[in-house]
Amino acid sequence: MARKGSVSQRRVLWLQVFGLAAVQGAIALTWVIYNLYLEDLLVTLGFSAALATTLLVIENAMGAVMEPLMGSFSDQRQHWVGSRFPQIALGMILAAICFLGIPLVLLVGSSVKALLPITLVAWALAMTVFRSPALSLLGRYAFEADLPQAASVLTMVGGVTGAMAPLAGDFILGMGPLAAFIIGTVVLLSAAFVLRQVHPNQSVSAAASLETNAATPWANLPWILGTGAGVALGLRLLLGNFPAAVAKTGFGQPKLIMGALFLTVAISALPCGQLATRLGNRLTMLIGLAGLVVAAGLTSLMATPGIAILVAISIGIAFSLIGNGTLP
């Protein structure tokens, strides 16, 4: 008879993986909404548009420092309490409150304008409380050899959600900040509820759970943090410049090609997960990194819309190869 909290008959707990994918989708959606509205919110209250870049740098720096700390604290809670979910739930509730508070500051007006940057940073900080502990649950839901397949589901959800920025950005902006941020808040809280309903403390086996909690995070932490930070920064710079490079080819709708890029991430996620299962996660990530470097080099050489589409597809596949491995 299996021990409570462990399921030794299955190599991947797909129900729990899908619950975790709901959290990943909520994280991605809130960041899409945040990035779409950030500059407009700041300018509306009289701040410089350049402050948006400064805030993103601060938030990325906070994430690099806080996520490992929150992961370590979550490990301690797992050891002493037997569950990471209380920290995850608390973080998601705090993040939802801060996220909803962002447009409310705008409604109050310029008399409390100083609260806007504080609320923006507070939301980003609240996101670090639960993201690392939540995604670390993936190690409980699959044996090591099957982790790329499980991670590919999260990568697919992230790709579909990321495609909303270029393909549905105008629609989201048309809703207005209050409606958009309310939707993001509801989705975030709903994802927490879904994760709770799928019994997040389950694991493929007690032995695998103990091994993952005790050894794997610390052994892989430099690799995960270094690769994740480097890829995130490089991809942000690449995607920031890619629409302008597409426009130079004469194509009038760069957003469509950006949408194709993110949809490629989603479509290729599962096949890339299968490939990573066969080749090993680290080798697959290195192949993806090499492909991303080559695609980035080709960006400056794009002469026609057709080449731009091929480069976008290449970037999407490369990101799928990398994404499965950078998930904790």
Residue locations for each model-derived region?
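Helix-loop boundary and gating motifs at the non-cytosolic
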Residues: A2-N60, N220-T227, V231-K248
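Glycine-rich segments within core transmembrane alpha-helices of 12-TM secondary carriers
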Residues: G63-A64, P148-D170
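Helix-to-loop junctions at the C-terminal end of transmembrane segments
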Residues: V65-V81, L173, S268-N281
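Structural signature of the two symmetry-related core transmembrane helices
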Residues: R84-G101, L283-L298
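Hydrophobic core of transmembrane alpha-helices in multi-pass small-molecule transporters
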Residues: C98-V105, S110-F130, I307-I322
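Intracellular juxtamembrane helix-capping segments at the cytosolic ends
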Residues: T128-A142, L321-P328
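Symmetry-related core transmembrane helices of the 12-TM Major Facilitator Superfamily/SLC fold
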Residues: A179-Q197
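C-terminal transmembrane helical hairpin of 12-TM major facilitator-type secondary transporters
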Residues: R282-G325
